[in-house]
C-alpha cells in the first residue's frame, strides 16, 4: 500500500475502541498520533499495537483538558484531522457524578475544538453513542430519530453533537462526522488487545468473560421483566474491529468530500438479548457462567438496535462479524489475559 502520510490525532487512542482503531489506521496507511491521559487505559495497549503492526507509535501522555500541552502537539504535529474518543463513559457513574462528566466530556471537547480551530485542523470524527436516542419507542433506530438522553453520560454526547452542528453551520471549512456506537464487544483476533476496564466494567461482555474465567463468582443481570422475548435487555452488539473500521470509512469520507456535520449509526442492525450473549459466550468458552437476576439499572432501556443502512450507503461500511466471532474473540482475549494488561 502506498503511504498516505496523513497524521491523525487520536484522543483516547490507548483505550478499548481507540487502540483497535489505531491498528486500522496504520493498516490503511495513516500515521496515528495518540493523546491519552491513561485514566482508563494502559500504555501496554500501545506497546501491543506496536507489536501487532510492526510500527512505532507517537504517544503523548496528555489530558485533553491540558490546553498548553495539547497546543504544543498541534504546533509541532502537522495534524490533518482528529478522531476524538477521549471521555468518561460509565452511565452509572455519570448519574452520581454529573459535574465530572460535563467537565471532562464537554469542557474537554471544547478545549480540543478551540485548538483545532486555532490550528485550522477542521476535520473531526467524533465518538458519539446510541445513548443520544434515549429510550426509543420503536426499533430499529435511524439517525433521524428524536434525540433525548436518559442519563448525564448520554447528555454529554448529545450536547457535543449540538456544538459540532453549530460549528459546522458557522464555518463551512469545518467537517464533522459523528459516529453513534451501539454496543462494542469482542477483541482483536490476535488476542493481544481487548477490553480491560480498570475499575468496574461499563459493558456487559467483560462481566461475562470475567465470570466465565472465575474472576467473578456470579454474573448480575439487570432486570428480566423488560418487554423483550426473554425479558432481558436487547442490544445491538458490534465487534470492536468492525467499529474501528467504521472510523477509517468516516475518515476517508471526510478527506474526500465536503461533509458539513453528519451522524451515522454504527451497529449490525440485529439485537441480541443479554441471555443470548451469555449463552453464546458459554459455547465459545466451554465454561459455566452462573448468573443472578437483580433489579433494573437506572437509565437502561429495554431494546436498542440500529438501522445501519445510511453508513452502508454513504460510507460504504457495514459490520461483517457475527455473534460467534464476537464471543470467540472476547474469550480469546480474556483467556490469554486473565488480568488484562496487568499480566504484562
From Swiss-Prot:
NAD(+) binds at residues 15-17, 36-40, 63-64, 85, 89, 157, 181. InterPro entries: NAD(P)-bd_dom (IPR016040), NAD(P)-bd_dom_sf (IPR036291), UDP_G4E (IPR005886). SUPFAM superfamilies: NAD(P)-binding Rossmann-fold domains (SSF51735). It catalyses: UDP-alpha-D-glucose = UDP-alpha-D-galactose; UDP-N-acetyl-alpha-D-glucosamine = UDP-N-acetyl-alpha-D-galactosamine. GO terms for biological process: galactose metabolic process; monosaccharide metabolic process. It is an enzyme of class 5 (isomerase). Transmembrane segments: none annotated. Its cofactor is NAD(+). One of its GO terms (cellular component) is cytosol. GO terms for molecular function: UDP-glucose 4-epimerase activity; UDP-N-acetylglucosamine 4-epimerase activity. Substrate binds at residues 129-131, 181-183, 202-204, 220-222, 235, 297-300. The keyword Mitochondrion does not apply. Keywords: Carbohydrate metabolism, Galactose metabolism, Isomerase, NAD. The active site is at residue 153. Pathway: Carbohydrate metabolism; galactose metabolism. Optimum pH is 7.9. It comes from the Eukaryota. PANTHER family: UDP-GLUCOSE 4-EPIMERASE (PTHR43725:SF47). NCBIfam families: galE, PRK10675.1. Catalyzes two distinct but analogous reactions: the reversible epimerization of UDP-glucose to UDP-galactose and the reversible epimerization of UDP-N-acetylglucosamine to UDP-N-acetylgalactosamine. The reaction with UDP-Gal plays a critical role in the Leloir pathway of galactose catabolism in which galactose is converted to the glycolytic intermediate glucose 6-phosphate. It contributes to the catabolism of dietary galactose and enables the endogenous biosynthesis of both UDP-Gal and UDP-GalNAc when exogenous sources are limited. Homodimer. After the expression has peaked the enzyme is released to the surrounding media. This is UDP-glucose 4-epimerase. It comes from Dictyostelium discoideum.
